């Protein structure tokens, strides 16, 4: 296992993300990277939450696009499920209703990363678990 933090790799920088992956040659990447915040931050910096989280996930996926042997576990979040989802939440409720308004930009970025991962699986044969 080769842990990596934001101090090791700037995931906003595609070249640095690629370099880290090439240098470490991982068999598996567990993507838990995200810009997160509380209710105040989520409401105040809505654009930053969606843009920054999209950049992080796009860079990780672009960095592995030419390396289909690298497996990726792309972690989601409870916020990707509808506001009125039953508790305990069932996977079948994904994309069946309105998201919690305070964190919908973050949730949409996570949902986009799931769809991007599915696209890489279908088009390039990557082994990605969302």
Per-range role (PLM):
Residues 105, 109-112:
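Active-site helix of classical SDR
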Residues 76-77, 116-130:
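Conserved beta-loop-beta element that borders a ligand/cofactor-binding pocket
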Residues 15-54:
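NAD(P)H-binding glycine-rich loop region in Rossmannoid oxidoreductase-like domains
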Residues 58-103:
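Conserved Rossmann-fold NAD(P)-dependent oxidoreductase catalytic core, especially the SDR/UDP-sugar
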Residues 4, 29-35, 72-78:
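SDR active-site strand-loop-helix element
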Residues 1-20:
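Adenosine-cofactor binding site in Rossmann-like domains, unifying the SAM/SAH pocket
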Residues 25, 68-69, 125:
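Residue-level detector of structured alpha->beta connecting loops
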């Amino acid at each position: 296992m080769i842990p990596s933090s934001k101090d090791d790799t700037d995931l906003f920088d595609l070249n640095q993300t690629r370099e880290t992956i090439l240098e470490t040659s991982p068999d598996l990447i567990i993507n838990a990277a995200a810009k997160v915040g509380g209710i105040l931050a989520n409401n105040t910096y809505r654009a930053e939450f969606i843009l920054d989280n999209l950049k992080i996930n796009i860079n990780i996926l672009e960095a592995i696009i030419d390396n289909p042997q690298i497996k990726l576990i792309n972690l989601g979040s409870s916020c990707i499920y509808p506001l009125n989802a039953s508790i305990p939440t069932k996977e079948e409720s994904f994309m069946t209703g309105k998201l919690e308004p305070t964190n919908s930009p973050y949730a949409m970025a996570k949902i986009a990363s799931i769809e991007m991962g599915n696209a890489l699986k279908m088009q390039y044969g990557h082994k990605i678990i969302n």
